[in-house]
Structures are given as structure tokens and as C-alpha cells.
Amino acid sequence: MTKPTIAGNRTGRKLGQRVKKKKLKASSREWLHRHINDPYVQRAQLEGYRARAAFKLLEIDEKHQILKGARRIIDLGAAPGSWSQIAAKVTGSTEDDIRVAAIDFLEMAHLPGVTILQLDFLDPDAPQRLVDAVGGEPDLVMSDMAAPTTGHHRTDHLRTMHLCEVAAHFAIEVLAEGGHFLAKTFQGGTERDLLNLLKQNFRQVVHVKPGASRAESVEMFLLAKGFKGRNVEHGTISA
């Protein structure tokens, strides 16, 4: 994959600089210091990506080859847009030939070659609008959706797993045969019914934790490769 033109450090801050914010709480100051000095954050700034999450997708793809040959891609929970940046590049999506659709309830700045829907994915109209935006069956459905955290691990896990399940049902209903599904999960166990559903409909199902995911994070990704097609029994989308 060709790397985008180096954009430079747009923050005006020297890389590796300390954070001096007297009014911030200690925990917030610690997080901000870690974020600014994170090598993946620095690389994202230098290579023109909107977020460090770009390297999670690139690392997963380096091992599992899910982007190669993709003609249409749908990005769920897309803001601020680093995965969509990569998707537009690999599909050759342009303003005249849109092949990438991104959705998030958060506002997301324009990206060339990407149709952006500022909408909750659980909205009943969202699935059809996404498929219409890319003009047919996608080869990859990827989801970085996560529910807002409450601080209660079990609650956070269940809420994010629900989003993962809805995304999985969507992928099964819209993917082209041979397509792939990638979704964020949290450590704490993937529901058996979801794993069974994916194993029934895909040729390979694995959990992956890319190096770009912070070591202390409970974040993981569920990858289902090689969609078997819709002649297989499967569930339907439920909000």
C-alpha cells in the first residue's frame, strides 16, 4: 500500500513534548501526556492519518490480507475517519465513483471518495443507505464501534458486544461472497451465539489484537474471513 504524502506535525507541538496543564486532573494530564507521546499518534500525524487507529487496520491487513482486492467497503463507527482513509485508497474510490461508505453519529469531516452518514447505525434506515452509497454488495464490512464506557467492565462489554452482533448480522445480509467482516470487541468473552453465527457463515473466524492496540487496553478485534454466501442459514438484523 502506498503511504500518503507526509503531512507534517499539524499540532505545532514538538514530538515527545511534556504536557503542562495545571488545571487538568492528574488522570487527565497523564492520559494527555501518554497520548501526545504515543509513537502511533506521532506516526499518524506524520503520515497524514486522522487517528492512530489506522495502524490497527494496517497491521491486521498485513497478516490477514482483508483489504486486497476489495472493491467496496463499509466502515461502521468511522469517526474521525482513518479507516475510511485507507479504504478509499485501496478501493480507488473517487468523488465520481464512490466505493466507500462511512457511518457515525459523531460529525466527521469530509473525505474524498467517501460517502459519510452522520447517523446512528441502529437507525432502521442506516443499513440500506450504506449499501446504496457504495452501489452494491461490499467486499469488507469493518466496525470500530464501541459503546460509551460507564466504568463498569461487564456493562461496557455487553453494550459493545451488542453493537458487534448487530454489525455481524448486517455483514451477513450485505457482504459479497468471499467478503470479510472485522469488528471491535472487548476482552471478556465473545458470546457463543455470535461465534457460532460467524463460523456458520464464514470460512475462518479469529480474534486478533494488533500491536497498535495499547497493551493495557481490553480492546480486541473479531475477524471473520471468506463469507460463504447467503444460501447458508443465518440470522437477521435486530436493533
UniProtKB/Swiss-Prot annotation:
Subcellular location: Cytoplasm
Residues reported in the UniProt entry to bind S-adenosyl-L-methionine: 81, 83, 104, 120, 144
This protein's UniProt keywords: Cytoplasm, Methyltransferase, rRNA processing, S-adenosyl-L-methionine, Transferase
UniProt catalytic activity: uridine(2552) in 23S rRNA + S-adenosyl-L-methionine = 2'-O-methyluridine(2552) in 23S rRNA + S-adenosyl-L-homocysteine + H(+)
GO cellular component, one term: cytoplasm
Root EC class: transferase
Annotated Pfam families: FtsJ
Catalytic residues (UniProt): 184 (proton acceptor)
E.C. designation(s): 2.1.1.166
One function term, GO molecular function aspect: rRNA (uridine-2'-O-)-methyltransferase activity
InterPro entries: RNA_methyltr_RlmE, RNA_MeTrfase_FtsJ_dom, rRNA-MeTfrase_E, SAM-dependent_MTases_sf
Family stated for the protein in its record: Belongs to the class I-like SAM-binding methyltransferase superfamily. RNA methyltransferase RlmE family.
Protein name according to UniProt: Ribosomal RNA large subunit methyltransferase E
Taxonomy of the source species: Bacteria, Pseudomonadati, Pseudomonadota, Alphaproteobacteria, Hyphomicrobiales
